[in-house]
């Protein structure tokens, strides 16, 4: 059984979250409009179409109406998690990565977490 020993609670992000978009920059590679699985004040779990090396320095960007965050981080882990989609039902490459956000930007990291938390609460209230 999986044991989660994280210091901070993770906020699950719904698959089709429309309150903002995530982007990841890994050197010359840029991944736009990628899925975020979860967010905490210290990290983000993302889906990307190719592997990223553990220890890579990346930038996580989040944009929503009237707000943008550009946060530096380090890839802590990357694992293949192919998905099946579409009529053909063929798997396509997908990698889940865990990014630890730079603790030197703790205020901006917390703002990202709070913005998502507020956005998700608004969606629940409207449902």
Which sequence ranges carry the predicted segments?
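N-terminal helix initiation/capping motif
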Residues: 1-41, 113-127
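Short conserved beta-strand and strand-loop elements enriched in small hydrophobics
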Residues: 18-24, 55-69
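Short, conserved beta-turn/loop elements at beta-strand boundaries and strand-helix junctions
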Residues: 41, 77-84
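Short coil/turn motifs at beta-sheet boundaries
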Residues: 10, 29, 39, 53, ...
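Short beta-strand-centered aromatic/proline hotspots
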Residues: 71-76
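C-terminal output/interaction extensions
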Residues: 83-127
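Short, surface-exposed secondary-structure edge patches
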Residues: 47-51
């Amino acid at each position: 059984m999986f044991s989660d020993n994280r210091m901070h609670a993770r906020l699950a992000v719904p698959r089709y979250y429309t309150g903002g978009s995530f982007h990841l920059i890994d050197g010359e590679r840029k991944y736009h409009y990628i899925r975020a699985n979860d967010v905490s004040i210290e990290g983000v779990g993302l889906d990307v179409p190719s592997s990223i090396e553990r220890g890579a320095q990346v930038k996580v960007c989040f944009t929503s109406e009237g707000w943008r965050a550009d946060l530096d981080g380090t890839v802590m882990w990357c694992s293949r998690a192919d998905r099946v989609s579409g009529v053909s039902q063929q798997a396509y490459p997908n990698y889940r990565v865990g990014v630890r956000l730079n603790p030197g930007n703790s205020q901006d990291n917390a703002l990202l977490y709070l913005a998502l938390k507020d956005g998700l609460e608004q969606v629940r209230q409207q449902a």
